[in-house]
From Swiss-Prot:
Keywords noted in UniProt: Antibiotic resistance, ATP-binding, Cytoplasm, DNA-binding, Isomerase, Magnesium, Metal-binding, Nucleotide-binding, Topoisomerase
Residues under site feature: Interaction with DNA: 460, 463
Cofactor remark: Binds two Mg(2+) per subunit. The magnesium ions form salt bridges with both the protein and the DNA. Can also accept other divalent metal cations, such as Mn(2+) or Ca(2+).
EC number: 5.6.2.2
Pfam families cross-referenced by the UniProt entry: DNA_gyraseB, DNA_gyraseB_C, HATPase_c, Toprim
Regulation acting on activity, per entry: Pyrazolthiazoles inhibit the ATPase activity of GyrB.
Name used for this protein in its record: DNA gyrase subunit B
Catalysed reactions, as listed in the record: ATP-dependent breakage, passage and rejoining of double-stranded DNA
Self-association state and partner proteins as the record states: Heterotetramer, composed of two GyrA and two GyrB chains. In the heterotetramer, GyrA contains the active site tyrosine that forms a transient covalent intermediate with DNA, while GyrB binds cofactors and catalyzes ATP hydrolysis.
Biological source species: Staphylococcus aureus
SUPFAM superfamilies referenced in this protein's UniProt entry, alphabetically: ATPase domain of HSP90 chaperone/DNA topoisomerase II/histidine kinase, Ribosomal protein S5 domain 2-like, Type II DNA topoisomerase
One GO BP annotation of this record: response to antibiotic
Length: 644
């Protein structure tokens, strides 16, 4: 579950009396998806966050500053913190030690009745008991009262009473668990990068806490990363702007509380055109925004317009900037902590508390206004950037109209080069974005015209990382894609209007093809990101080689496969190898059989797992700072496959 700023009312009184019991654990193993979302790889990793979040509660309450997560042999997980240790005295209602109640009873925790944590997003103890129920084995060690207490469980059932196993001069809690393979049938193997990304994010969002991740599964190659950011989300913004050119050296930073709502905001403008706004409530990434984002945007637009007019940078009232104009080239993070967060939206990642809007608006507007008046040169640059964005917006409006279709049935306005499919059901429809007209011809002949549409792209599309929306919308290839997809773009984007649920990038297997693929992915990431988040974007995998032996043909997709095939084939009859450099070299039948036929093809689905890394990668590869790109090329040249 989520965690937030915690305030334990009285250190001495944090004991069993404050752990309240609501209900039993029986349902968890029967319907695990209700408690952790799914039993897939994502649900498996969710177990780790349930335990880590409890440790973060302790840290934010001021009782811990170190958390360690270890992936042990056989994919055991160990989470250690140096907090006070879970209470071990007898819980009155259950007549059992509080630590056992927390680990075996659903909705038992220190967040009910006001006696434990004052502010917390999750229900402290819910996570622990759910993890216990879904674990093959779980062990707890509590360092408290100069004593080490220990208890072990199998599938949530205690194997013996809580016992004393030693003395200690430390305090804290250690929980070890192994996920139950009967529940997690897809996998019980943890992904280091998945854990690393969230742990880094938690370290940014909770400044001053040190969180360490260690992987001990391979004794020869133990991997460890430790994260500790005294600057918190200010450091986060600086990292996101690392490959950009900031307009002002230091991010604007505010960290204040009002009406028991803690507000932390960091914002820094750069010379680019993309907006990067990340919002969090009680450490949960609110992908769908919410009232904290609304309050911030409202204050930002109002204050910039007020400053622009009063300082005469903007001449008249009609020159007012829109919200979109004020956010061009802005990197910002909003993090709030609330005692009772209400989450809404399709994925429960939208903050709904109405009182938050006014609090964020008031705190941020006061601070931002003061910053502008104290830094007039930076203020002028930001306002003038907004004015340029407004002009581009007006110019883009006309171009945007060209890409708009009245409805999904408005076939007349579809691009002329598009060979559309006959099905009108988006769930089964796919569109192939094909490099070059000649390959486009082959794919049109070889496709299944009922469900497969083809849009040939001539040449390289515009690098959107270096362009404003008006210029982007004047690019013919981009305009055709927007019209064909039917979703709109930027602020007008509507995923529900997507005409295809598979958008397949199909380029040549050479350097030019890779460049076009990167340009397309940059466009999707910056202007149609929900397509990626919904899992609609794919990359086709055309074969690299055709190996012929007598009448037998083999299509091979990479060098490793080729080496394996060559080692397995008889030397007679003699075989020959042809390398495909372009899609146009294959006829329609070959393209269908190797790359487009759903029965045989291989597609790579584009996923967005680490927003920080994705943003930095696109900026580094496609942005203005040459030095970082040169360094990347030098570091990775050894892995390159060059075509001469």
């Amino acid at each position: 579950m989520v965690t937030a700023l915690s305030d334990v009312n009285n250190t001495d009184n944090y004991g069993a009396g404050q752990i309240q019991v609501l209900e039993g654990l029986e349902a968890v193993r029967k319907r695990p998806g209700m408690y952790i979302g799914s039993t897939s790889e994502r649900g498996l990793h969710h177990l780790v966050w349930e335990i880590v979040d409890n440790s973060i509660d302790e840290a934010l309450a001021g009782y811990a500053n170190q958390i360690e997560v270890v992936i042990e042999k056989d994919n055991w997980i160990k989470v250690t913190d140096n907090g006070r240790g879970i209470p071990v005295d007898i819980q009155e209602k259950m007549g059992r030690p509080a630590v056992e109640v927390i680990l075996t009873v659903l909705h038992a925790g220190g967040k009910f009745g006001g006696g434990g944590y004052k502010v917390s997003g999750g229900l402290h103890g819910v996570g622990s008991s759910v993890v216990n129920a879904l674990s093959q084995d779980l062990e707890v060690y509590v360092h408290r009262n100069e004593t080490i207490y220990h208890q072990a469980y199998k599938k949530g059932v205690p194997q013996f009473d809580l016992k004393e196993v030693g003395t200690t001069d430390k305090t804290g809690t250690v929980i070890r668990f192994k996920a139950d393979g009967e529940i997690f049938t897809e996998t019980t193997v943890y992904n280091y990068e998945t854990l690393q990304q969230r742990i880094r994010e938690l370290a940014f969002l909770n400044k001053g806490i040190q969180i360490t991740l260690r992987d001990e599964r391979d004794e020869e190659n133990v991997r460890e990363d430790s994260y500790h950011y005294e600057g918190g989300i200010k450091s986060y913004v600086e990292l996101l702007n690392e490959n950009k050119e900031p307009i002002h050296d230091e991010p604007i930073y505010i960290h204040q509380s009002k009406d028991d709502i803690e507000v932390e905001i960091a914002i820094q403008y750069n010379s680019g055109y993309a907006t990067n706004l990340l919002t969090y409530a009680n450490n949960i990434h609110t992908y769908e925004g919410g009232t904290h984002e609304d309050g911030f945007k409202r204050a930002l637009t109002r204050v910039l317009n007020s400053y622009g007019l009063s300082s005469k940078i903007m001449k008249e009232e009609k020159d007012r900037l829109s919200g979109e104009d004020t956010r061009e080239g802005m990197t910002a993070i909003i993090s709030i902590k609330h005692g009772d967060p209400q989450f809404e939206g399709q994925t429960k990642t939208k903050l709904g508390n109405s009182e938050v809007r006014q609090v964020v608006d008031k705190l941020f507007s006061e601070h931002f206004e003061r910053f502008l008046y104290e830094n007039p040169q930076v203020a002028r640059t930001v306002v003038e950037k907004g004015i340029m964005a407004a002009r581009a917006r007006v110019a883009a409006k006309k171009a945007r109209e060209v890409t708009r279709r009245k409805s999904a049935l408005d076939v007349a306005s579809l691009p002329g080069k598009l060979a559309d499919c006959s099905s009108k059901s988006p769930e089964e429809c796919e569109i192939f974005l094909v490099e070059g007209d000649s390959a486009g011809g082959s794919t049109k002949s070889g496709r299944d015209s009922r469900t497969q549409a083809i849009l040939p792209l001539r040449g390289k599309i515009l690098n959107v990382e270096k362009a404003r929306l008006d210029r982007i919308l004047n690019n013919n290839e981009i305009r055709q894609m927007i019209t064909a997809f039917g979703t709109g773009i930027g602020g007008d984007f509507d995923l529900a209007k997507a005409r295809y649920h598979k958008i397949v990038i199909m380029t040549d297997a050479d350097v030019d093809g890779a460049h076009i693929r990167t340009l397309l992915l940059t466009f999707f990431y910056r202007f149609m990101r929900p397509l990626i988040e919904a899992g609609y974007v794919y990359i086709a995998q055309p074969p690299l080689y055709k190996l012929t032996q007598g009448k037998q043909k083999y299509y091979v997709y990479n060098d490793r496969e080729l080496d394996k095939l060559k080692s397995e084939l008889n030397p007679t009859p003699k075989w020959s190898i042809a390398r495909y450099k372009g899609l146009g070299e294959m006829n329609a039948d070959q393209l269908w059989e190797t790359t487009m036929n759903p029965e045989h093809r291989a597609l790579l689905q584009v996923k967005l797992e680490d927003a920080i890394e994705a943003d930095q990668t696109f900026e580094m590869l496609m942005g203005d700072v040459v030095e970082n790109r040169r360094q990347f090329i030098e570091d990775n040249a050894v892995y390159a496959n060059l075509d001469f």
